[in-house]
């Protein structure tokens, strides 16, 4: 059976948790393959219960699904334990969560350095969440990181942390005038935390490939979005990992030929958190309307999201760099009650028209949107369950987005609940 990749096709916050939750009952495995607790998924169950997840895959809320934190994720042990306890306190079975032995651990010095560097950056800061994600990935690439499996050997763990702090403390004390961290204290705290998760450590790549050989379905769940990818996003205003579909293989250990479907998640308008270019951003009453009606506040950061009209340029770009086969369009209901609904179909940069993503970041920053206006609709669509239940103008909007994005819109979200979804094509049946 196939592996299916689920990715954000904009700047994150597209509603990936809803998509995972919808598919979760028909898959056997859900894998988080990159990022850390710098992103969040919100899942609303049919009972009305609302869950905000940051590290743990959304499949944890579906009985019978095995969930994996893959090797591409950076794991803050304290956040992991807090999230597990929060789920267990609400009656969620967490026994089905495994953690790749090769995932990297986010350490206290990563958080300290992240916060102080961002503070000293002043006006040039990139809007990091301050959770240590970037510094942890830096250590991973520099081959100085602490892996999850290291907690199984206290002597090796102590040696690695002592070596890391020789340099980190120099940076904290001599450059930023901060207090040094005690290696023994860091080791002791981590080993204490490890008692709460070391029974979950597994050879994830082996288990996942064995599952595929047994014809089980594996859903690979990305965090953030395409335009935040460190290689393909609006650099330097990006995350430190690869949320794009290519990162799914690297961050899970599943070979690319195993992947048969790439499901992109698109919000019916566009949002972004933090700094960076955003060609369709709105600063008027329409932006305020989208923010209020869409509840646009970051799950992890609590920061208000910047809002703008749908940008077909970045949707086409996401289709291309991810090889997207299907789209899940979310929050279509938010656009009800608008007289017209503009779609960005291209840009002008220094007076020249382009329908593609500009090659340089300076050009993206100067890009002015070219809009095509579609008539809006006034009906409440939250009860629609079939495509034909939508008003004609809402259907026209979806079909135009589909045409511009270059991939089939297979699912449409018309509200936050799991059941508030229109399925036009069964993604699993076509995989």
Swiss-Prot record:
Its main location: cytoplasm. It comes from Mycolicibacterium gilvum (strain PYR-GCK) (Mycobacterium gilvum (strain PYR-GCK)). The lineage of its organism: Bacteria, Bacillati, Actinomycetota, Actinomycetes, Mycobacteriales. Binds 1 Mg(2+) ion per subunit. Its cofactor is Mg(2+). This is Adenylosuccinate synthetase. Plays an important role in the de novo pathway of purine nucleotide biosynthesis. Catalyzes the first committed step in the biosynthesis of AMP from IMP. Substrate binds at residues 299-305. It is found in: Cytoplasm. Mg(2+) binds at residues 13, 40.
